[in-house]
Amino acid sequence: MTLSNTERAIIESAIRDIKDFPKPGIVFKDITTLLNNGKAFGVTMNHLYEKYKEYNLDYIAGIDARGFIFGAALAQMLGVGFVPIRKKGKLPYTTISEKYSLEYGFDEVEIHLDAFSAIPNARVLLVDDLIATGGTAAASVKLINQAGALCVEACFILCLSFLDGYKKLQELTEVYSLVEVK
């Protein structure tokens, strides 16, 4: 399922570009303007609902922090549970974690060990606002699988395709994005 030209235009026009943030030479894609535009947010969420309503999902997993917004909203629309994937040290119960590399070092994400224990072999959709290099998303897919579930697809509002992160992620799961930034 793809966006219509009208839907794509509504979503793209609602995302603000911030030049030189967080450092010179970077153009930051600010989704807060999409979130505070009821029409654009509605078009986004309705499209995701229509795409995923027949996937027989058990959970939506959202990546800290903007993935929580889209993921929790979609989970409610689909009538499934929501599972947060957080930066290390933010979850209160027993967790498993996965490291991933950054430009200068490493970071780590974690999930509750029992996040999917209520449904054996749970079918999970991973959601985040954007995929760039793919490190966080790849670590998140690995966590979902380590926790005993199956990540059936990873979904992003934006894909920065020039960074090739989606290619790395395609080795682990199917990948879908609403808007591609070349």
From Swiss-Prot:
Compartments where located: Cytoplasm
Pathway the protein contributes to: Purine metabolism; AMP biosynthesis via salvage pathway; AMP from adenine: step 1/1
EC number: 2.4.2.7
GO cellular component, one term: cytoplasm
Catalytic activity, reaction form: AMP + diphosphate = 5-phospho-alpha-D-ribose 1-diphosphate + adenine
Keyword tags: Cytoplasm, Glycosyltransferase, Purine salvage, Transferase
A Pfam family matched in the record: Pribosyltran
Enzyme class: transferase
One GO-annotated biological process of the protein: purine ribonucleoside salvage
GO-annotated molecular function: adenine binding; adenine phosphoribosyltransferase activity; AMP binding
Signal peptide limits: none
Subunit note: Homodimer.
Family statement: Belongs to the purine/pyrimidine phosphoribosyltransferase family.
Role: Catalyzes a salvage reaction resulting in the formation of AMP, that is energically less costly than de novo synthesis.
Protein's name according to its UniProt entry: Adenine phosphoribosyltransferase
